[in-house]
Amino acid sequence: MAKLNRKLRQDSTDRYKTKLYLWRNLGGLIPEDMAISVTESITADWKQYNDMMSKVRNETLDILKTNKVATEDYIGYIAFAEELAHQVWKNKNSSPDPNTANEASKTDLESKYSDVYGLDVTVLDAIYNAVIPIIMGGGS
């Protein structure tokens, strides 16, 4: 238990995730090494996803500044980028043909955001072209 307690003192995020895993699995009656390794694996997955989403947001902001988009419209474009990135992430991990699925997602989201929210299609295309390499290429 000392090893687990040392781990719990390191970081509040790890502490929370480890406790959550312990509480949800057999009332905490699992080996501590298993809890630690699973927590580290989950944390690594979340970190990879969150790092990619952060890159998507930063790239989107650069595109919006380059195209001189009004500041009040930023939230719509960022929402489009995040929703698109999430769809691309899901397609990458589950679809047999992610490129076709990505094009379908782009078409659906683009029509939604341009027709309903009145966003510029050329900016949406630029965001799409920036999001695809970030997510499909692993975040570069």
UniProtKB/Swiss-Prot annotation:
Give the source's domain of life in one word: Viruses
Q: How does it assemble?
A: Heterodimer composed of major capsid protein 1 and major capsid protein 2.
Protein location: Virion
What domain comment accompanies this record?
A: The N-terminus projects into a DNA groove.
Q: What does this protein do?
A: Self-assembles to form a helical, filamentous nucleocapsid mesuring 900 nm in length and 24 nm in width. Together with capsid protein 2, wraps arounds the DNA and maintains it in an A-form. Capsid proteins probably maintain the DNA in A-form by non-specific desolvation and specific coordination of the DNA phosphate groups by positively charged residues. This certainly protects the viral DNA under conditions such as the extreme desiccation of its host.
**Quick one: a GO cellular component term?**
helical viral capsid
Q: Quote the Pfam families the UniProt record gives.
A: MCP_C
Annotated GO molecular function terms are: DNA binding
- The reply on keyword DNA-binding is yes
Which keywords does the record carry?
DNA-binding, Virion
> What protein is this chain from?
Major capsid protein 1
